[in-house]
Amino acid sequence: MVNFEGVKGLENCKWEQRNANGPVHDMPRYDVSIPYLRMLPGPLDYTPGAMLNATRDHFFGNNNHPMNQGTRVHQMAMYTIFETPLQMLSDAPHKYRRNQECTDFIAKVPTVFDETVVLDGKVGEYIIMAKKAEGVWYVAGNADDF
């Protein structure tokens, strides 16, 4: 077993509905809850890496041009924070070609780590993690403050 599903991944943003207050679901808050709750039993399959990002005020579900709530940096941090030995990409290849810095980061960040330390955090608000792979530490943080 490499990854377990059981996560509301980014594909759900394609059909995300809005109400008077914005999107029905707060994906950045969800993203900073997963490490504390869903990752306890083991690796997950989330598919981060959305290249079209928006604030809650500007986000809307769209099958043809899917977007995500939050920032691109939020998306990149999930590649380190989430335990996912078989990592995936959530967007179209041409979007990664247009965002070479992100593509290079995704290609270089390990998917398996030797050591993990939660440096600080609060469920549903933020998380800061350090992970070590082959003697190199990777530090990432995410928050629900978009």
Tell where the protein language model's regions lie, with residue ranges.
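Active-site proximal loops enriched in glycine and acidic residues that flank catalytic Cys/His/Asp
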Residues: 1, 48, 92-93, 141-143
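Aromatic- and carboxylate-enriched substrate-binding clefts and catalytic-loop regions
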Residues: 1-65
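Solvent-exposed, flexible loop/coil residues
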Residues: 6, 48-50, 55-56, 92, ...
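Residues embedded in well-ordered secondary-structure elements
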Residues: 35, 70, 119, 128-130
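Charge-patterned, long linear interaction tracts outside catalytic cores
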Residues: 46-91
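Flexible loop/turn segments at secondary-structure boundaries
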Residues: 53-55, 88-90, 97-99, 137, ...
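Catalytic cores of secreted or luminal carbohydrate-active enzymes
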Residues: 73, 77-119
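Carbohydrate-binding surface patches
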Residues: 123-146
